[in-house]
């Protein structure tokens, strides 16, 4: 850059215009070299501020083979995701670079564009096995890579490849969608595209109810199973092994010490690995006396007395009972 530099005329010559060149002579010439106007462009990921750092900006319109260094911070008009013109370049300083002299260039008057890209969000969470491949928004409560204290809301349903229990299963986005949250969190500044989305499916705990007739023991066998409280999707399971209760007598809802009681999928439609046995309770119901034999001498009456008892069947072990009335 210079003003009024003398020019060695070389082959410079006058030619006819509206006048005749022969009426004039070229005595001298001078050249003003002005600064070359630089353009700039850049981008960053949304970070909730209006800074455009030099490291995110690329200079253009340099003379071929020349390069410049630049440093500092420019400003854009909004922190939100979108395309902007840099409004304040005063904070950017250009310096000599490889083959390039800073004084030959200026940022003033150029075209300066800057893009703020959406920030990629990851979502993850945990739920109990439910016999589906759904990953609903309410199960994906952890949102990562948000700026500062910003929060977002999530709606919709994604999917996982397998319904079965497992850790960190990849979630396909499906209809999952971000919505504005709190502390300045705007959905338009974020995207699920390209994020890491994971769901852990844990075993669903089952509580078993067992029922049997009084048998004089405190044993509760898997074959006494009456029902489970939380099987999913119409699935079936059974029990094997034995547990114990503290009271052998007729009762309802006695807590069972599980012992060797275990979930058993033999002949069932469910996988044992998708469930855990949390607890069991036992209902002991009265044992019916199937036959009572009474004998009496003919006495011309239709009365049968308890004292006529001879035997009872279906009693447990050596237990005995008497009749009255």
Task: Please give the residue ranges for each predicted region.
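Short loop/turn motifs that initiate or flank beta-strands
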Residues: 1-325
């Amino acid at each position: 850059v210079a003003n009024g530099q003398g020019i060695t005329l070389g082959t410079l010559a006058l030619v006819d215009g509206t006048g005749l060149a022969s009426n004039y002579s070229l005595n001298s010439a001078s050249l003003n070299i002005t600064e070359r106007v630089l353009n700039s462009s850049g981008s960053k990921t949304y970070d909730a501020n209006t800074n455009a750092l030099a490291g995110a900006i690329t200079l253009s319109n340099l003379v071929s083979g020349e390069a410049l260094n630049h440093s500092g911070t420019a400003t854009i008009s909004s922190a939100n995701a979108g395309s902007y013109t840099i409004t304040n370049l005063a904070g950017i300083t250009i310096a000599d670079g490889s083959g390039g002299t800073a004084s030959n260039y200026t940022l003033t008057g150029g075209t300066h564009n800057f893009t703020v890209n959406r920030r990629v969000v990851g979502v993850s969470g945990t739920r109990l096995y439910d016999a589906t491949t759904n990953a609903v928004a309410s199960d994906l409560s952890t949102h990562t890579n948000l700026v500062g204290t910003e929060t977002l809301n999530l709606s919709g349903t994604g999917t996982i490849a397998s319904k079965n229990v497992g850790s960190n299963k990849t979630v396909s986005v499906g209809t999952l969608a971000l919505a504005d949250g709190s502390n300045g969190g705007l959905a338009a500044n974020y995207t699920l595209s390209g994020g890491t989305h994971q769901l852990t499916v844990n075993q669903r705990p089952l509580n078993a109810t067992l029922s049997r007739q009084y048998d004089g023991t405190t044993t509760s066998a898997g074959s006494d199973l009456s029902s489970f409280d939380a099987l999913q999707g119409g699935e079936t399971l059974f029990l094997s092994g034995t547990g114990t209760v503290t009271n052998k007598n007729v009762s309802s809802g006695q807590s069972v010490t599980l012992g060797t009681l275990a979930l058993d999928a033999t002949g069932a439609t469910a996988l044992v690995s998708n469930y855990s046995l949390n607890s069991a309770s036992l209902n002991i119901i009265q044992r019916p006396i199937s036959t009572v034999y009474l004998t009496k001498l003919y006495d011309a009456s239709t009365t049968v007395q308890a004292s006529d008892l001879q035997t009872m069947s279906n009693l447990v072990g050596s237990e005995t009972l008497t009749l009255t009335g």
